[in-house]
């Protein structure tokens, strides 16, 4: 972001010096104070302090919502320094906003919890915007427009991701996506990589199949080829899984889902480790990926998050650990019950011992800070609140079960405080076609269930009556 032709006036330098001092103090505060906090404390407070509130925001306990398009400056020197990205101001809400800063700082700290290095975050208007924000910088043309470019991704992924990769990138831009069908097979990953591969991409746990892969092994493979690993861990949230601690370079979150469990809006985020691995990128991008894409790429594309939504999502995040614990426990109970139901063909849930990736997921998916809880006093596995099950009798019978649900909401959403179900083949994954669904392992008789905070017995009763009514 620096430019050797920039002219720094004495007045600009004064602003730069003052802001460098501010950044150094904030960094020291994070190291001396925030990094010592438990996960829940970070989720509740982030970097919004009592001092900030009293000195700057008339004592507001909740982060203020800045409903302003742009920022005013004291003089031309401050404006010039700001627009040259020499000082950390927000300039214009298409680029940044004080409300989104608090959102980003909190998510960066949560995804980086337990990680020795630094993490930064770029907010986006949706999860799909987060995915494009994360992958686009690695797909630049460096020599000629005809140069071959490819990337490797898990076939078990969200339907929107499949569309973005297969249609927007492959068909429209001739950038090849090489699908990995068995993400647990490291040889398959390796066989797809060549000198033109820009990054590896994986979703875990995947939606709706609940597949998983070995993050550290795939990250090591990526780094051996000098390319980054990008992970979508929306389903787990940082309360259960933080891929950066296991070697991933970048994490994308559809904050719309579990992190904004109230359902009050659409939001996304890209969280990256500093000094990530990539032989294709410039040094400034690698040094601070999230900040770089925020100030350059996304300034031009415009997928920034609305400040009102930033604070609303931030308030949902404060209790994410407790919610994921509660809903994971409920999902485990429901999955166990459905696993022996006479009308159910199979159940897909990572918490079940008979799931093919149960042992692998158990290495990575833990309720953060459970060892400090009086209730547990030890590390405990939690596998999230998304599960799927296949109904005996085929697609028509499955739709009958689905249509007979009374308490569970029929919708394409997930991550809600209320339980929601859908049939992926006719909704979230219908656009990728039968061949694409077969590749991803999504049969017509699959129902995806995202368990909310209701008592699990009431959800089980609704499922049981729906399964029996459709006999």
Show the residue positions of the predicted features.
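Short loop segments at secondary-structure junctions
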Residues: 70, 272-277, 391-394
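Short amphipathic alpha-helical segments
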Residues: 88, 119, 266, 308-309, ...
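Conserved C-terminal alpha-helix-loop-beta "cap" of PLP-dependent enzymes
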Residues: 45-55, 344-447, 451
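Conserved PLP-enzyme active-site core in the AAT-like
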Residues: 2-43, 48-56, 110, 116-342, ...
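Hydrophobic side chains in well-ordered alpha-helices
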Residues: 134, 397-401, 459-463
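A glycine-/small-polar-enriched, mobile loop at the entrance of the PLP active site in fold-type I
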Residues: 55-56, 62-109, 300
